[in-house]
């Protein structure tokens, strides 16, 4: 098998869905910005050498339909000869796209692929515009369609995760994210997005241009008292609230994935080396625990132990789910999400895995660590985990 490297890995800042800066920015535009940004970070690479674009998207319809990867690649200015594919493994779609690119390169099917993900939760609702469940499953296994919030309630109930513990976890996520932003830790991975707005101005709306650079999810005004005051969002007697759940978000991310030999020939210094990727199925009604079963598989493929991993980016779908994974998988909490997670920074579904890849690579370099892991729970009852090596 050939060695595969990550030559660049970038993301847009993440906007709050519905009321945030990216609410009117199309997901294909966001993806194009991320693709262009990733390619521009590798000036030695002629775009004509890119053989494919793979983009993940959890709800690939409407503005993010029509094979959004192809639309975005053309919008990014890549040559028409560069083919493109959109893939979907729900929340791990962005990580899956990077793994698919790497595996294809490992087996000699390509030398250079751009991979990532995009999602506008402002434009495409959770579940898409028309949810049409399978009648047999509705009758025989209705939990296959259990809402994500209720799956988190199941995890919290079975594992005894208390409301205060979940809210404390959420508060720490905001505090770590704010510290990371103030310390400029995300600056290198973020590609700014220029956004036009129309603001009220009497009979003639005023056009305003802004350059969006900073994730807008983290809240400096939150507190444990404020979080504890929120009502349960999914079950009247539950513990899962809007405050201890991931934010609905808009964003995109992309990476240039290459064979090590081609990178060396072009004089490209790698950011990281791709090591392994694994998925696992689990009960849909406790889908948030999927990483517990994917992580050991990814470690085994890599020939590593959990103690070898220096940084872990665990997608914070819900605080209860995150605490459940940390407990059941035996993760070192000090290594998990050192710069905050999706509860503070947002979760643009199909983008997030690629976004977290950009983050884990930079954190490895700051810590002079060797191995980093990105791991995600997946709606429908799955987990995914990918391992990268600092170079």
Regions found by a protein language model. Name each.
Residues 119, 125-131, 147-154, 192, ...:
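Conserved N-terminal phosphate-binding loop of PLP-dependent enzymes in the Aspartate aminotransferase
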Residues 88-118, 156-186, 254-261, 326, ...:
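Active-site-proximal alpha-helical scaffold in enzymes
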Residues 57-110, 131, 142-153, 221-247, ...:
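Conserved catalytic cysteine-centered active-site region
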Residues 27-43, 68-72, 97, 148-155, ...:
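Short, well-ordered amphipathic alpha-helical segments that serve as non-catalytic structural scaffolds
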Residues 1-27, 222-289, 293, 300, ...:
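Condensing-enzyme catalytic core mediating Claisen C-C bond formation in acyl metabolism
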Residues 10-13, 24, 28-33, 44, ...:
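N-terminal extracellular/periplasmic Venus flytrap/periplasmic-binding protein-like
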Residues 22-113, 118-135, 190-213, 285-286, ...:
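Conserved beta-ketoacyl condensing-enzyme motif
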């Amino acid at each position: 098998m050939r060695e595969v490297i990550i030559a660049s890995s970038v993301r847009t800042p993440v906007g709050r869905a519905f009321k945030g800066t990216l609410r009117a920015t199309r997901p294909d535009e966001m993806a194009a910005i991320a693709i262009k940004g990733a390619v521009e970070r590798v000036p030695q690479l002629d775009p004509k050498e890119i053989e494919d674009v793979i983009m993940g998207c959890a709800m690939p319809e409407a503005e993010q339909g029509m094979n959004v990867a192809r639309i975005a690649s053309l919008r990014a200015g890549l040559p028409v000869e560069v083919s493109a594919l959109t893939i979907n493994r729900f929340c791990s779609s962005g990580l899956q796209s990077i793994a698919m690119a790497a595996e294809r390169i490992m087996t000699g099917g390509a030398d250079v692929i751009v991979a990532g993900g995009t999602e506008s939760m402002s434009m495409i609702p959770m579940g898409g515009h028309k949810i049409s469940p399978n009648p047999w499953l509705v009758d025989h296994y209705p939990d296959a369609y259990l809402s994500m919030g209720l799956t988190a309630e199941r995890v919290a109930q079975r594992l005894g995760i208390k409301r205060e513990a979940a809210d404390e976890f959420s508060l720490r996520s905001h505090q770590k994210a704010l510290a990371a932003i103030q310390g400029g830790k995300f600056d290198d991975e973020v590609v700014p997005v220029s956004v036009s707005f129309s603001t009220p101005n009497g009979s003639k709306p005023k056009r305003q241009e802004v350059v969006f650079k900073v994730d807008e999810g983290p809240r400096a005004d939150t507190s444990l008292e404020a979080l504890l005051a929120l009502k349960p969002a999914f079950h009247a007697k539950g513990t899962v609230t809007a405050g201890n759940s991931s934010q609905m978000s808009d964003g995109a991310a992309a990476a240039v994935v290459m064979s090590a030999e081609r990178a060396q020939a072009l004089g490209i210094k790698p950011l990281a080396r791709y090591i392994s990727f694994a998925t696992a199925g689990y009960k849909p009604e406790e889908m948030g625990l999927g990483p517990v079963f994917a992580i050991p598989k990814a470690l085994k493929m890599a020939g590593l132990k959990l103690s070898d991993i220096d940084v872990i980016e665990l997608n914070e779908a819900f605080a209860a789910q995150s605490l459940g994974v940390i407990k059941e998988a035996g993760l070192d909490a000090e290594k998990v999400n050192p710069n905050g997670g999706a509860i503070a920074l947002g979760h643009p579904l199909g983008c997030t895995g690629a976004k977290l890849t950009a983050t884990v690579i930079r954190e490895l370099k700051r810590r002079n660590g060797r191995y980093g892991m990105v791991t995600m729970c997946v709606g429908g009852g799955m987990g995914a985990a990918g391992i990268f090596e600092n170079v």
